[in-house]
């Protein structure tokens, strides 16, 4: 097994702050290095205060209002999804769309890859985060995986696929209705490319699999490891 190290270091930023009556304020910053590809991430411990200052408390009434106002024109709602969304041709997806439970997958009208599909996760137009059930997420992932297999059958060079999800506008979603996106083709995106190349370099150097070694390290550390479901390890 290779020597996986979680490198991090802390720094402080000092300034005179109007939020503290122009007294000195000190912010703690933590820099973390990715053990595989070496990229650096910065954690600002005071960013939660920035969010609260700029956006205030969550306005649940406003969220409900936006959800209700957007529902009549939502193409992902069950009364619209089969009549207003695009379909795949039979050479890519024999059934034109993929349906698993309440999840329905269809082509993205504005694709960013050779294969780019959207998966409406549920018939319900708006969900609170606590209402995302295991079944809802599992159905969506299964629909996306079925599409991945169909895409590969249509083009065996389409080996680089990702499944992505962001919810509501602060996370970058353009519509309210819960959904996932699955996309890719024969060209990997930068982050995926770096991960694949880093994994190969690690194997050539250590003669072991980085991801198996990472799980072993995480289990021993007992800081982030959650558990295992089938062949899937959760961190």
Regions found by a protein language model. Name each.
Residues 1-235:
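HIT superfamily nucleotide-processing domains
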